[in-house]
Curated annotation (Swiss-Prot):
One of its GO terms (cellular component) is extracellular space. Residues 31-81 form the BPTI/Kunitz inhibitor domain. Pfam families: Kunitz_BPTI (PF00014). Belongs to the venom Kunitz-type family. GO terms for molecular function: serine-type endopeptidase inhibitor activity. This is Kunitz-type serine protease inhibitor B2. It comes from Daboia siamensis. The keyword Cytoplasm does not apply. Expressed by the venom gland.
Amino acid sequence: MSSGGLLLLLGLLTLWAELTPISGHDRPTFCNLAPESGRCRGHLRRIYYNLESNKCNVFFYGGCGGNDNNFETRDECRQTCGGK
């Protein structure tokens, strides 16, 4: 296979990996956790994965503690947990 063909194949595989939704089997278990604001009193806008709606929603994080279902962006949440 030529180098151009290999490059095309690599590009297609990368695109497929980005567009393939994450199944429940592949989703990290922390995506199933309810959002936790933590024990501090900050008011940071964060995103969590909502298992029931399969969406990445906003919550407010206190700044410390909490759990791993806590993302800075919706894109990060979607890439990790597969939400909409």
